């Protein structure tokens, strides 16, 4: 194991180098990943986020993995943009069960000018509660990223999904370069980036390596890198894809950790299908972030109490955030709710 792969942050990874990491003996790869992980993080702390779908279904994009796409009949009930107050109530519940970051996702190709004021109010309200804020709203232009940053958004999620070479087999309604441009706008606006991909869509090892190379060779690494295992949903074109080999999934986490040593690597969608032993291996491989709660946008996620029981058995604790005194925090929640109720846009959000 070279020093260059234990502690140094690089942005010049080659396909040959990354494939060599994947092809190491499993235990050697895990040892290397855990060594890198310990050089930058407390190995027994995991960042905990909660994800809420603020607008569900009828998305005009044709992503073959997604039950929210309007192109496929998955039986998903379409919902309009959630009212601001309801979003804040969900954020308060998320904080109460231990989440430190609240992520809000909308099934849009991009947010419209009509939607943006409501979205900005959500960010401000959640931020006032002392939670980190994250959103995934689709493609953004430069002015939208500036507005979100000004409202206090900490993270923007915009996944690359897979390698540039395989991307066209999965999505045709948005280009890879458009995704990279959105990430550049987010970074230029001063926000942190959450960007990763999905395993199990029929991609090759070269594609998995290619995705990680795209992320690791960005001018700055994403602060958060979600690695998703495809959740196969009836009605989507990928519903009959073969399951991902569990060891291959763990290898993906480990290589992500080595390539992006200071990023949080998130064990994301598909965790419901993972047994406790696989999740423990994921943490050993360097995963140090999870989504917490019962629902991950439109598919099941392990129940929160099960997560905490597993954490206790493994000696893992949720990563701490800067805490406000309880009375200060409660006042912030109440003030945020009052401000939303007095806003003209508050009651109209559901009809946006």
From Swiss-Prot:
Cofactor requirement: [4Fe-4S] cluster; [2Fe-2S] cluster
One GO term (biological process): biotin biosynthetic process
Residue sites binding [2Fe-2S] cluster per the record: 103, 134, 194, 266
EC number(s) per entry: 2.8.1.6
Oxidoreductase as UniProt keyword: no
Pathway linked to the protein: Cofactor biosynthesis; biotin biosynthesis; biotin from 7,8-diaminononanoate: step 2/2
Residues where [4Fe-4S] cluster binds: 59, 63, 66
Catalytic activity: (4R,5S)-dethiobiotin + (sulfur carrier)-SH + 2 reduced [2Fe-2S]-[ferredoxin] + 2 S-adenosyl-L-methionine = (sulfur carrier)-H + biotin + 2 5'-deoxyadenosine + 2 L-methionine + 2 oxidized [2Fe-2S]-[ferredoxin]
Radical SAM core domain location: 44-262
Domain of life the protein comes from: Bacteria
GO-annotated molecular function: 2 iron, 2 sulfur cluster binding; 4 iron, 4 sulfur cluster binding; biotin synthase activity; iron ion binding
Keywords: 2Fe-2S, 4Fe-4S, Biotin biosynthesis, Iron, Iron-sulfur, Metal-binding, S-adenosyl-L-methionine, Transferase
InterPro entries referenced in this protein's UniProt entry, alphabetically: Aldolase_TIM, BATS_dom, Biotin_synth/BioAB, Biotin_synthase, Elp3/MiaA/NifB-like_rSAM, rSAM
Cofactor mode of binding and number, as noted: Binds 1 [4Fe-4S] cluster. The cluster is coordinated with 3 cysteines and an exchangeable S-adenosyl-L-methionine.
Similarity field: Belongs to the radical SAM superfamily. Biotin synthase family.
Role summary: Catalyzes the conversion of dethiobiotin (DTB) to biotin by the insertion of a sulfur atom into dethiobiotin via a radical-based mechanism.
Subunit structure: Homodimer.
NCBIfam families: bioB (TIGR00433)
Protein name, per record: Biotin synthase
Source organism per UniProt: Pseudomonas putida (strain ATCC 700007 / DSM 6899 / JCM 31910 / BCRC 17059 / LMG 24140 / F1)
Lineage: Bacteria, Pseudomonadati, Pseudomonadota, Gammaproteobacteria, Pseudomonadales
Encoding gene, per UniProt annotation: bioB
